[in-house]
Amino acid sequence: MLRRAGILLRPDEAANLEIADLGLGDLEHVGLQIVVYVNTERCCAKELVLLPRQICPEHRHPPIRDYPGKEETFRCRYGRIYLYVPGPKTTNPHAVIPESRKSNFTVWHEVELNPGDQCTLRPDTPHWFQAGPEGAIVSEFSTKSIDEADVFTDPEIKR
């Protein structure tokens, strides 16, 4: 999918591709693939690769001591992504959630991102997203990423 999107990875980047099933063992439906280009004290850049209809489940990036939490911008590079954030509930959302997990999704304001579209989220904003039927690649640009501090709505998730 990365090649189709015109995104080339160096061998070391490809070797460090993270397959994140989030401890659920259901990667086909829930999880994502992550390429981290840089993650310093001040900035982070990643590619988030999602299979068709794959979900990155609801979570937020809370403050930690004197760090206000991660602010992030998502830019769609390939496919379509449905991003869900606080706001008025979308009447007919595109998301398809496994029935057994629906109670773990609380924000339903849909923002559709197509290639070239982007959306910025403030720290500690609950959000989740799902790829469209062809999968999706999203570039994430953010302040420092501390993935192990993410707070997921689903208590079964282990990061």
Task: Indicate where each model-derived feature is located.
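Short beta-strand His + acidic residue motifs that chelate non-heme Fe in jelly-roll/DSBH
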Residues: 57-58, 66, 83-84, 111, ...
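Conserved double-stranded beta-helix
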Residues: 40-59
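A short, N-terminal "cap"/entry segment at the start of jelly-roll beta-barrel domains
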Residues: 1-46, 64, 99-103
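His/acidic/aromatic-lined binding-pocket segments of jelly-roll/cupin-type domains
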Residues: 46-48, 65-76, 110-111, 119
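Double-stranded beta-helix
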Residues: 90-106, 126-159
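Glycine- and acidic-residue-biased ligand/ion/polar-headgroup-sensing regions
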Residues: 51-52, 69-91, 97
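Residues that act as N-cap/strand-start positions at coil-to-secondary-structure junctions
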Residues: 42, 68, 105-107, 113, ...
